[in-house]
Amino acid sequence: MKNIAILSSGGDVSGMNPAIKHFVEYALHNGLTPYFVYNGFEGLIDNKITKASHSDVAGIINRGGTILGSSRSKRFMLKNYREVAKKNLDALDIDMLIVLGGDGSFRGMDIFYKEHGVKFCGIPSTIDNDINGTIYCLGVDTALNVIKDSIDNIRDTASSFSRAFVIETMGRDCGYLALVSSLCSGAELCLIPEVEYNLSSYEDSFKEQIKNGRKYFIVIVSEGIKDNSKEIAEWLEQKVGIESRVTVLGHTQRGGTPSIYDRLMAYKFVNHAIDALLGDINSSVVCYSKTGFIHKDIDEITSQKYMLDPELLSYLKKF
């Protein structure tokens, strides 16, 4: 019987636990012995590896985060620690790994594969949805729902007090969360890192809207824009003339009960990952495209920066 392990690396997302649950179920279904690696690549080095069973994943499908824990391992970037990790896997006869993470995690795992021949398949897992080669990453739908609920709640109080609210989403280099949540929440302004902006260009329009009876504004910004959220709020007060508040959603976006869509995508991602490893695709990332699931190698994933969908960007012109 072959042995296969799973770990989560980097930022956690809702959807990891459903993926972990199905990993155990589908591995056993295929005659494999499933193992958990705790605390990401750190767990490979520290030998925090245990055999998994159905009882270990009972009741986790509705939980956010990851029961395995996660980490950003600097030690795994060093060859001597990767050698320790290989010895720990060899002791348990594990030669296949599934990695829930981002492109940094996949690059580290690709080095490990080239050095030691441990086969792996990556499942894109980041709420930023910024991995090149896939149009969807695990956790994004749940994060968008968390953001949507927050904006809806903030709109209630904004309208009651005639205020503007600047709502900051995650997305240091990618404005996907801010843009999609703006479109789906009726925001009056959206600012993202990918698109240059000049706040003064909005002043006349905003003042005119207030003159015509608008009582509040919802402004959604990505954390990666050139101005911080406090500066946007100060602009609204000083130049537009409306009392303003800032809400930074922060790590709330990573939590929450996994949505139906993320549970379904977790199921599909895991199926394709295990099938790939059993089908002798030794080093790949499962990507979701407009035509379905495909496997891409790490060089293809990391060769260029993720770009927002041009159609989505075209909608930004409405703001």
Swiss-Prot record:
Allosterically activated by ADP and other diphosphonucleosides, and allosterically inhibited by phosphoenolpyruvate. It is found in: Cytoplasm. It holds the Pfam family PFK. Pathway: Carbohydrate degradation; glycolysis; D-glyceraldehyde 3-phosphate and glycerone phosphate from D-glucose: step 3/4. Keywords: Allosteric enzyme, ATP-binding, Cytoplasm, Glycolysis, Kinase, Magnesium, Metal-binding, Nucleotide-binding, Transferase. The active site is at residue 128. GO terms for biological process: canonical glycolysis; fructose 1,6-bisphosphate metabolic process; fructose 6-phosphate metabolic process. It catalyses: beta-D-fructose 6-phosphate + ATP = beta-D-fructose 1,6-bisphosphate + ADP + H(+). PROSITE patterns: PHOSPHOFRUCTOKINASE. InterPro entries: ATP_PFK (IPR022953), ATP_PFK_prok-type (IPR012003), PFKA_ATP_prok (IPR012828), Phosphofructokinase_CS (IPR015912), Phosphofructokinase_dom (IPR000023), PKF_sf (IPR035966). Mg(2+) binds at residue 103. ATP binds at residues 11, 72-73, 102-105. Its EC number is 2.7.1.11. ADP binds at residues 155, 186-188. Substrate binds at residues 126-128, 163, 170-172, 223, 245, 251-254. GO terms for molecular function: 6-phosphofructokinase activity; AMP binding; ATP binding; fructose-6-phosphate binding; identical protein binding; metal ion binding; monosaccharide binding. Its cofactor is Mg(2+). GO terms for cellular component: 6-phosphofructokinase complex. Belongs to the phosphofructokinase type A (PFKA) family. ATP-dependent PFK group I subfamily. Prokaryotic clade 'B1' sub-subfamily. Homotetramer. Catalyzes the phosphorylation of D-fructose 6-phosphate to fructose 1,6-bisphosphate by ATP, the first committing step of glycolysis. HAMAP family: Phosphofructokinase_I_B1 (MF_00339). This is ATP-dependent 6-phosphofructokinase. The gene is pfkA.
